[in-house]
Amino acid sequence: MLRQNRAGLLLVRKLHCSVVVMKPFDISQLARDNSSEKRNQGFNIESLIKNRMDLETDKVVSENATAAPNRFATMFDKEKRQAQKKTGPRRNSESTHHHNAGPYPKKPYGKTNSGSKTRPEIKTRPHKRVVRFEFKTGSDQAQAALKSIIAKVHALSTNYKIKFIDPVSGEVKLSNLVDIANSTDLREAGLQLLPCKEGDLPSIKKVSTREMLKLYSDELAAEKEKALLQSGSVAAQRALNQRLKSERKKSAAKLLNIFWNISLGDLKNQKKTELANRLCKGETFTIYLKRKGREVATPEGEGDEESETLNMYDIRRSLAHDEDALNIETQRRELISQQLFCILDEMPCTYEVEGQKENKLKVTVSPRQDAVKQSISPSSEECTLSAKDLKKQRQLQKQKEREELLKLKKQEKEDNLDSLYSFKIED
């Protein structure tokens, strides 16, 4: 009985303390109280008596627990909020500091002494220049070409700052593309974007409208061809191959190979005519005097190992491989080179000679602009004719020769028949 009364008193006391302190009651403590350690302890009557000192301490603990600050309760307290409305926020308060926080200082929004409401001050930023390109002149194609140049410049310089080459003085000046484009009459002139280094301002110069349109059309054609090649077009691949072949022919047309074993008659007749035709067209070309072992002339500085001096390979067809044959070949090369120089001296051109006769000679020939064209083997009419016209004339001439040959053959047959008939009649 005493043990049961003791446990009941302890339970009542703990419930009372939890209610006063506003803390949840931990039921697990009952298990701790009923542990074996407390069972072994003896009965203590003093624990059942709650003296005056214990009551006073419990009262102090309960007052401290109820007086603990609650920030949500104080924040939403009606009396304090009404008092703040009457007095207004303090200047150095946290709310004012939070209101003024930002990139620009702001004044507290409220009534001033005069009674008018003040608005926060906003600093105005400097006004940016409005970029406007005007397309009032020129055709649609010219305007499209100018727009493509503007797009390229914008990719290099977003503010359209450029280096403009003055067409009169040729000086390079810093300018803006807006001013240059708007002041250009596309009916008379156009613009061209020059290649520049990475990080530099783009360079612009004035060109003719025709040249600007040609560059723009070439650019569009290249983009179209690239797209067709990526899609696997066979026609585009064939056109590309044809263009590459024509470019190779043009580059090969600027070279003229003359071998050391050429005869003097061919040099005076055939090669002289070919040189005259090229000079009449105003071409600048290069002549290579070399041995027949190489078909393509190598530029300077390349193939030094193959370009050995005159040796037995140059006279491999000779029967006697001795010094006499070597001297004969040297004299022959001297004679051919001197004959070529005499032919060039008779023509209205200038030339420069490089190399050695023991290996090969490189002769760069350029026509003289001021010199009067002399009457060389090809007539002046042949020089003015184009390549197609010359080809047609040659074809007509060959056709005439064939017709004449056919006529001669027919006459021979008829004569043979007449002679045969006359022979039979006589018999």
Curated annotation (Swiss-Prot):
Localisation per UniProt entry: Mitochondrion
Gene Ontology, cellular component aspect: mitochondrion
Pfam annotation, one family: mIF3
Location of region: Disordered: 71-125, 372-396
Main location: mitochondrion
Zinc among keywords: no
tRNA processing as UniProt keyword: no
Protein name: Altered inheritance of mitochondria protein 23, mitochondrial
Source species, domain of life: Eukaryota
Disulphide bonds in the chain: none
Compositional bias segments (type: Polar residues): 372-383
Transit peptide (residue range): 1-22
Family: Belongs to the AIM23 family.
Record keywords, A-Z: Mitochondrion, Transit peptide
